[in-house]
Amino acid sequence: MTDTSTNPAERVGPAFSVDGMLLARQKTQQAIRDISGKIVPGMLEEDAVAMAKQVLLDSGLGLSWHPTRVRFGSNTTKPMKVNSDPGIVLQENDIFFLDIAPRFNAWEGDAGQTFTVGNNALYQQCALDAERLFHEVRGVWEKEQLTGRELYEFARVTAESMGWRLNLDLPGHRISDFPHAAIYRGDLAEFEACPSPMRWILEIHILDPEGRFGAFFEDMLLDASCYSRSHMPDADVT
């Protein structure tokens, strides 16, 4: 993968490195797996956040460029800029998601994923559909070279066809060597060009139409070769 972007909104800093960004992504996704494996029914959301921070610290990822978030149950409906309701305990049949943004050396990581416990089929479908929608949007980006605004309109329509509502309060954002916010603070959903690979985080947050729960998935926009088919939902990813 080569660095070819010339759009001013897609500038990077002096420490940007393709290999570095991919390594930060790899370490961030491993941390997601490590944290999710330690979350069990009966755990308080605040305790899960503290545990997640400790896992990141133990993994050499003690610096983060946005708060470490764990959302349980009804808190999965909330936009990231809204604080969780306190005192939420993970139930035996429940849904939760993680949103972490560690820095590895000079490079920003960012990943989010939804998990379920128990056997609630609706929760399981929501978690699966968030990831599937990500890959459908990513696939149409790669095939049709849509703008950021067009990608989120496609995501909105597709989410509704799945029976969910897309939360556009999570509209995607830049990523690069730290700090990307010093370069560009605009949203992917407002970007009027086709996004370049390794410049943007595509955020997908879908909500139950009745507002009871939601699911979240995010990753860098990258070409299909960067994704393992064995970990993809049933979606067209080429």
Task: Locate predicted features.
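Active-site neighborhoods and metal-handling regions in enzymes and metal-associated proteins
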Residues: 1-238
